């Protein structure tokens, strides 16, 4: 047989096995006996061993790599994998849908939702180029995940090649990897028989199995996957419906949950929630709630995102698993901002497969409202199936010697006064950086990956540096020397050099990361990014007023007040000045000369409808570059309304108020002039 004949035989076998895999793993409809499948598979293996020039990465034989990886490499997602905001009650769901409707151009409309079970597994992103699986990654931080390509290939229901003749140039497919309940129980039973470690729950089992350096271990675990969405997609027209996109994924060869449903409005969503809640225990996989997504992709794009979550989707969590135990003591922890948080110490109890011995009491308002005493028998719940909390007290079991929980007058760490403002539920230590607990938490935050990212500066080393009086302020970190570090327990010269190198590397940063690292109350990553976009340096931000700050997106009155207060404190400015003197720097944005004669300069502009030549974010960026202020709502202060096709209520309101209306053609002339 010549090369062409051999290649054709290999392709025929590959196509046959793909067909068998699809019917067996996706449709649950085996086409041939196992023996026949094994014969085909063996024949393909023999061909590829004899003629390795015809071995391709999409071959069914390549699902398991024989060489374990040394580490997981980072992989950037083309489109961010954002987490969902959670709702726990009917009122929260109604509020979520109301907020979404109010932000739409046509607010008086009945929304259609795609409803899906929320699997309790591990989210993954699979990238296909030209129809072939090229890499897969975990969610990671939403922007960058870990490369688990070899491990994903061990899941038989993941197609290595899309089942279409005209695939997208590139497509990201998102899914949830899980282990079915029955397989989980069987795996643990075998592990117990062999004296091996068992998993606490199916989610841990799935995550631990997928993140194995040796993919052969992943292959030995009963992993499965359901796909729930599409990320980036190039050179392919996708349907304008999430449900239709899920059907497209099925055509591509992916498994999609058969429990996906269409629902209309709040009542439709609640009906689905009750349906899945009743069915939860009968499902072959673990779920911890349901997910609602507005079905229209164009409406999704119109709503966009807030911080790290979409405005068009949310997770409706089921009531978490609850257990009963005794509260034996209360400790107080001090956080980065001085918040004194009560923590319940409990008689250990298993809740949802996890042994719980500590639980949050939130704050003293909650303690008073629930009438919690030391010695009480309490109900523990894993809130969101993650953070254990004390839900309530069983009063009839209260012992005679039960004691009230008292707010400490002094910080349990530094002895400073603990105060509680009249309008706040949280009590705070006033010790500031004098308080070792606050300094430690502040240093940990400052060094974290999303802030200054000082690799190697972990909590154990921070404890040593603070407890031994080596570091008193954040800036002291950048004056550490080799001898001091090398003499610390468990450090040595090599570790000390690595830390000094990491400190030096961290000096080159960005303004938004630096602002986030400072730990200003109420300012997270998103808020720091907004501030950095509007103020290029500390001096200009120091001069900002509360009123000015409140004009920025995502900066409300409380956050604005904390920003102004932070930069009004002399000791904060001293630390910042010292950090800058020690070499922390970031690229200065180039000054753009704005033509003040352009018609948008200094004007308030609102965008509505769909522009045929660019997306809304691009149009907004062009307007901002021209010195305009872009607003999300029409008012008497609006100067121009840029109206694309399908403009809705904003156009009506602008007409009523006499606001100048600009069509797309005129808008393009103005921005390009």
UniProtKB/Swiss-Prot annotation:
State the reactions this protein catalyses. NAD(+) + (deoxyribonucleotide)n-3'-hydroxyl + 5'-phospho-(deoxyribonucleotide)m = (deoxyribonucleotide)n+m + AMP + beta-nicotinamide D-nucleotide
Q: Which SUPFAM superfamilies match?
A: BRCT domain, DNA ligase/mRNA capping enzyme, catalytic domain, Nucleic acid-binding proteins, RuvA domain 2-like
> Origin, by domain of life?
Bacteria
Gene3D superfamilies in the record: 5' to 3' exonuclease, C-terminal subdomain, 6.20.10.30, BRCT domain, DNA ligase/mRNA capping enzyme, Helix hairpin bin, Nucleic acid-binding proteins
GO terms under biological process: DNA repair; DNA replication
Q: Which residues form the BRCT domain?
A: 595-673
Q: For this protein, what is the EC number? A: 6.5.1.2
Q: Which cofactor does it need?
A: Mg(2+); Mn(2+)
Family matches, as PROSITE patterns: BRCT, DNA_LIGASE_N1, DNA_LIGASE_N2
- Where do the catalytic residues lie? 118 (n6-amp-lysine intermediate)
Q: Which InterPro entries match?
A: BRCT_dom (IPR001357), BRCT_dom_sf (IPR036420), DisA/LigA_HHH (IPR041663), DNA_ligase (IPR001679), DNA_ligase_AS (IPR018239), DNA_ligase_CS (IPR033136), DNAligase_adenylation (IPR013839), DNAligase_N (IPR013840)
Q: Which UniProt keywords apply?
A: DNA damage, DNA repair, DNA replication, Ligase, Magnesium, Manganese, Metal-binding, NAD, Zinc
Q: Cite the binding residues for NAD(+).
A: 34-38, 83-84, 116, 139, 176, 293, 317
Q: GO terms for CC?
A: cytosol
Q: Name one Pfam family in it.
A: HHH_5
Q: Which family does it belong to?
A: Belongs to the NAD-dependent DNA ligase family. LigA subfamily.
Task: State its role.
Answer: DNA ligase that catalyzes the formation of phosphodiester linkages between 5'-phosphoryl and 3'-hydroxyl groups in double-stranded DNA using NAD as a coenzyme and as the energy source for the reaction. It is essential for DNA replication and repair of damaged DNA.
Q: Which HAMAP family match?
A: DNA_ligase_A
According to UniProt, the name of this protein is DNA ligase
């Amino acid at each position: 047989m010549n090369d062409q004949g051999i290649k054709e035989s290999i392709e025929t076998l590959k196509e046959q096995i793909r067909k068998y895999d699809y019917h067996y793993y996706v449709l649950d409809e085996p086409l041939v006996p196992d023996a026949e499948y094994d014969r085909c598979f063996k024949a393909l293996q023999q061909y590829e061993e004899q003629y390795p020039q015809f071995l391709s990465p999409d071959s069914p034989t390549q699902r398991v790599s024989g060489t374990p990886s040394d580490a997981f490499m980072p992989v950037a997602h083309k489109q961010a994998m954002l987490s969902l905001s959670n709702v726990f009650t009917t009122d929260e769901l109604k509020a979520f849908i109301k907020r979404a409707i109010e932000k739409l151009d046509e607010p008086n409309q009945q929304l259609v939702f795609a409803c899906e079970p929320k699997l309790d597994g591990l989210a993954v992103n699979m990238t296909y180029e030209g129809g072939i699986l090229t890499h897969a990654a975990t969610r990671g931080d939403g922007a960058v995940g870990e490369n688990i390509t070899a491990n994903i290939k061990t899941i038989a229901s993941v197609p290595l090649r899309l089942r279409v003749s005209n695939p997208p140039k590139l497509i990201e497919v998102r899914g949830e990897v899980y282990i079915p309940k029955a397989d989980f129980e069987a795996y643990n039973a075998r592990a117990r028989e062999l004296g091996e470690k068992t998993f606490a729950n199916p989610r841990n089992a799935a995550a631990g199995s997928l993140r194995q350096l040796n993919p052969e271990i992943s292959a030995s675990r009963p992993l499965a996957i359901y796909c729930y969405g599409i990320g980036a997609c190039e050179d392919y027209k996708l349907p304008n419906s999430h449900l239709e996109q899920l059907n497209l994924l099925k055509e591509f060869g992916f498994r999609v949950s058969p429990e996906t449903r269409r629902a209309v409005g709040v009542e439709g969503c609640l009906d689905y929630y009750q349906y899945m809640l009743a069915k939860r225990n009968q499902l072959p996989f673990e779920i911890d709630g349901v997910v609602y997504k507005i079905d229209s992709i164009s409406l999704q794009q119109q709503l966009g995102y807030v911080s790290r979550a979409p405005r068009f989707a949310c997770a409706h969590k089921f009531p978490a698993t609850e257990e009963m135990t005794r509260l034996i003591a209360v400790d107080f922890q001090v956080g980065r901002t001085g918040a004194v948080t009560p923590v319940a110490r409990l008689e250990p109890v298993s809740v949802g497969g996890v042994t719980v011995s500590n639980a949050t009491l939130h704050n003293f308002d909650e303690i008073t409202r629930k009438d919690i005493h030391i010695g009480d028998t309490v109900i523990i719940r894993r809130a969101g199936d993650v953070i254990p909390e004390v839900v309530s007290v069983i009063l009839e079991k209260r012992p005679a010697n039960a004691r009230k929980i008292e707010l400490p007058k002094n910080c349990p760490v530094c002895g400073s006064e603990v105060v509680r403002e009249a309008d706040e539920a949280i009590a705070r230590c006033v010790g500031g950086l004098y308080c070792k607990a606050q300094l430690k938490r502040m240093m940990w935050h400052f060094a974290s990956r999303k802030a200054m990212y000082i690799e190697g500066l972990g909590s154990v080393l921070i404890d040593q540096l603070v407890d031994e009086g080596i570091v008193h302020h954040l800036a002291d970190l950048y004056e550490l020397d080799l001898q001091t570090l090398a003499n610390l327990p468990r450090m040595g010269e090599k570790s000390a050099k690595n830390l000094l190198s990491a400190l030096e590397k961290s000096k080159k940063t960005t303004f938004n990361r630096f602002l986030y690292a400072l730990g200003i109350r109420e300012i997270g990553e998103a808020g720091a990014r907004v501030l950095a976009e509007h103020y290029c340096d500390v001096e200009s931000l120091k001069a900002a007023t509360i009123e000015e700050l409140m004009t920025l997106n995502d900066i409300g009155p409380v956050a604005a007040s904390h920003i102004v207060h932070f930069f009004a404190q002399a000791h904060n400015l001293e630390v910042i000045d010292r950090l800058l003197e020690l070499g922390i720097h970031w690229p200065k944005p180039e000054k753009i000369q704005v033509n003040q004669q352009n018609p948008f300069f200094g004007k308030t502009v609102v965008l509505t409808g769909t522009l045929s030549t660019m997306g809304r974010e691009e149009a907004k960026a062009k307007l901002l570059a021209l010195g305009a202020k872009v607003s999300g709502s029409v008012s008497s202060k609006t100067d121009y309304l840029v109206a694309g096709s399908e403009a809705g209520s904003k156009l009506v309101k602008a007409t009523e108020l006499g606001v100048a209306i600009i069509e797309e053609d005129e808008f393009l002339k103005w921005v390009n002039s």
